[in-house]
């Protein structure tokens, strides 16, 4: 019996239009009523996730910034990790010869010098917005993470350069095909879920986790029950071939799985 459920947002709980479907909301409420502790593990900002939780009236722990922050439902900060100022400085002021736009996250919000309203489509449900900022003048301390947004091929080239420059000073991963993130070393959703489970006195064997992207890899591999979305990144499927694959986020596959698990816990699950 799972005691802790960890859920990625984009490509997992959220549908392609970045909305949280009614079936998914109902399934999450049922899971909570059954006594399972909920945790949303996402690259999204704490401020945005709090707005989302208010909309669905659900109590949950928040793992935000891809594991750089953990908050209790009460709002208490349980864990925080930032990029070192040296790494933030190197990324912000380095010349990377890339077409990718640059986005910086700290506790105040989402900062960028790229005014592209299309980026807000993914945040329409919450109303979360970026703040236009001269990133070259931004202090390098207290930076949670830095993201690059571009097509996947351009980001693959950039990833090689970042890894060569930063080495073990940062954790670099794809949170989507078009988003490459620079995080503090050792920071990922899996490490954050381990820290949260220890805080709650729950073993990782009693955790189930759902995800679709490479920033979910550690969380899915460490959870007692890791479930991969049918729309997952090919790299994730290749790296975790032993984990079960459920349906597509467009069909609210997490809700489908949870409903089966709640109603028929002893029967094998089929995505169809």
Swiss-Prot record:
Mg(2+) binds at residues 8, 10, 212. The active site is at residue 8. One of its GO terms (molecular function) is 4-amino-5-hydroxymethyl-2-methylpyrimidine diphosphatase activity. It catalyses: 4-amino-2-methyl-5-(diphosphooxymethyl)pyrimidine + H2O = 4-amino-2-methyl-5-(phosphooxymethyl)pyrimidine + phosphate + H(+). Its EC number is 3.6.1.-. Keywords: Hydrolase, Magnesium, Metal-binding. Gene3D superfamilies: 3.30.1240.10, HAD superfamily/HAD-like. It comes from the Bacteria. CDD domains: HAD_Pase (cd07516). Pfam families: Hydrolase_3. Its cofactor is Mg(2+). Belongs to the HAD-like hydrolase superfamily. Cof family. Catalyzes the hydrolysis of 4-amino-2-methyl-5-hydroxymethylpyrimidine pyrophosphate (HMP-PP) to 4-amino-2-methyl-5-hydroxymethylpyrimidine phosphate (HMP-P). This is HMP-PP phosphatase. It comes from Cronobacter sakazakii (strain ATCC BAA-894). The lineage of its organism: Bacteria, Pseudomonadati, Pseudomonadota, Gammaproteobacteria, Enterobacterales.
């Amino acid at each position: 019996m799972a005691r802790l459920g960890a859920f990625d947002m984009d490509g997992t709980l959220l549908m392609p239009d970045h909305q949280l479907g009614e079936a998914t909301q109902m399934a999450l409420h049922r899971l909570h009523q059954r006594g399972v502790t909920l945790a949303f593990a996402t690259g999204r900002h704490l401020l945005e996730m709090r707005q989302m939780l208010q909309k669905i009236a659900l109590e949950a722990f928040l793992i935000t910034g891809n594991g750089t922050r953990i908050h209790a439902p009460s709002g208490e900060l349980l864990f925080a990790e930032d990029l070192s100022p040296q790494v933030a400085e190197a990324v912000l002021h380095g010349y990377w010869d890339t077409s990718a736009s640059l986005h910086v996250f700290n506790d105040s919000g989402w900062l960028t010098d790229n005014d592209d309203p299309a980026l807000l489509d993914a945040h329409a449900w919450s109303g979360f917005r970026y703040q236009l900022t001269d990133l070259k003048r931004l202090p390098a301390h207290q930076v949670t993470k830095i993201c690059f947004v571009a097509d996947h091929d351009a980001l693959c080239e950039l990833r090689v350069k970042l890894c060569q420059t930063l080495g073990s000073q940062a954790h670099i991963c794809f949170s989507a095909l078009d988003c490459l993130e620079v995080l503090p070393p050792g920071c990922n959703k899996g490490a954050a879920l381990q820290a949260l489970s220890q805080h709650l006195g729950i073993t990782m064997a009693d955790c189930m986790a759902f995800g679709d992207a490479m920033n979910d890899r550690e969380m899915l591999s460490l959870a007692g029950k890791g479930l991969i979305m049918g729309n997952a990144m090919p790299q994730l499927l290749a790296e975790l071939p032993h984990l079960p694959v459920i349906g597509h986020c467009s069909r609210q596959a997490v809700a489908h799985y949870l409903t089966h698990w709640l109603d028929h816990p002893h029967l094998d699950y089929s995505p169809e």
